[in-house]
Amino acid sequence: MKIAILSRDGALYSCKRLREAAEARKHSVEIIDPLSCYMNINSAAPSVHYRGRRLDKYDAVIPRIGSQITFYGTAVLRQFEMLGSYPLNNSVAVIRARDKLHSLQLLAREGIDLPITGFAHSPDDTGDLIAMVGGAPLVVKLVEGTQGIGVVLAETRQAAESVIDAFRGLNAHILVQEYVREAQGKDIRCLVIGNRVVAAIERQAKAGEFRSNLHRGGSANNVKITAQERAIAIKATKTLGLNVAGVDILRADRGPLVMEVNASPGLEGIETTTGFDIAGMMIEFIEQNTQRRFATSASISKS
């Protein structure tokens, strides 16, 4: 197969591993910067051009699109879909997952347990917003944040009001969530491919920090997840229409709570911790689904 990886930086661990895994299975791979693509959008002969040349058709495309370029990156991904490439995650699902509010609303609608969450733009009554989610301590997030950026733990009501007022000054959308104290700065990252949780790790925030993101100095260990945690990770992935996702879960006294569903999960932490070939599993999933698609197309053409 010919596989395109959409990424701004082919030197990143995840991109390198996906390329290695695909080439080990005798596929040709090209890493393409989506911001260097431009598109011809028409009904007769749509195309994608890249750095002065028209790109050939790819059998599959793997989106590794950073949150900062979601709009243009998913437009490029959508163009590849128009041309018949199989997407590891399709553009609609990626956009859905990147919209934190929309994704939480979809998960809640499907009965998936979440931390109590409030959403606001410029609340006139900060006190009511804080009370709505159970009071302090609570976590205040910028909707556009990633990897723990724009996330603040407010230990007291006064601190929460100050943080919310500061974020309001940025003219930003704000998520306010209950702080799950019993999680003790830990969460579980479940890596879902298709209908399976193929790996899971427990992430622990570093001393003095409440965010467990590995990019912020957190540590990771192997963990055995429960059947309930496995089921909720798969359901959350399917609810957003994703084939592959990193689902972050908090262990609360009332049961597992989904914090976030990541459409482009990093592979370094989970591969190095578990020793599993996650990249290889992703390529195998693509193989199975492109073969199924080609078989279906052949059957339709014969009929």
Curated annotation (Swiss-Prot):
Name the residues that bind Mg(2+) 1.
D248, E260
- Give the residues the record marks as binding Mn(2+) 2: E260, N262
Give the matching Gene3D superfamilies.
3.40.50.20, ATP-grasp fold, A domain, ATP-grasp fold, B domain
Question: Binding residues for Mn(2+) 1, per the UniProt record?
Answer: D248, E260
Query: Which InterPro entries has this protein been placed in?
Result: ATP-grasp, ATP-grasp_RimK-type, ATP_grasp_subdomain_1, RimK, Rimk_N, Rp_bS6_RimK/Lys_biosynth_LsyX
Q: Which GO terms describe its biological process?
A: protein modification process; SOS response; translation
* ATP-grasp domain location: 104-287
The cellular component terms of Gene Ontology attached to this UniProt record, alphabetical and capped at eight, are: cytoplasm
Q: Which residues bind Mg(2+) 2?
A: E260, N262
Q: Kindly list the positions annotated as binding ATP.
A: K141, E178, Y179, D187, R211, S212, N213
Alphabetic keyword roster: ATP-binding, Ligase, Magnesium, Manganese, Metal-binding, Nucleotide-binding, Protein biosynthesis
- Cofactor, how bound (note): Binds 2 magnesium or manganese ions per subunit.
What GO molecular functions are on record for this protein?
Answer: ATP binding; metal ion binding; ribosomal S6-glutamic acid ligase activity
Q: Which cofactor does it need?
A: Mg(2+); Mn(2+)
Q: Does the keyword Nucleotidyltransferase apply?
A: no
Please state what class of enzyme this protein is.
Answer: ligase
Q: Keyword ATP-binding, does the record have it?
A: yes
EC number(s) on file: 6.3.2.-
Identify its protein family. Belongs to the RimK family.
**Name used for this protein in its record:** Probable alpha-L-glutamate ligase
Q: Which organism is it from?
A: Pectobacterium carotovorum subsp. carotovorum (strain PC1)
Source organism phylogeny: Bacteria, Pseudomonadati, Pseudomonadota, Gammaproteobacteria, Enterobacterales
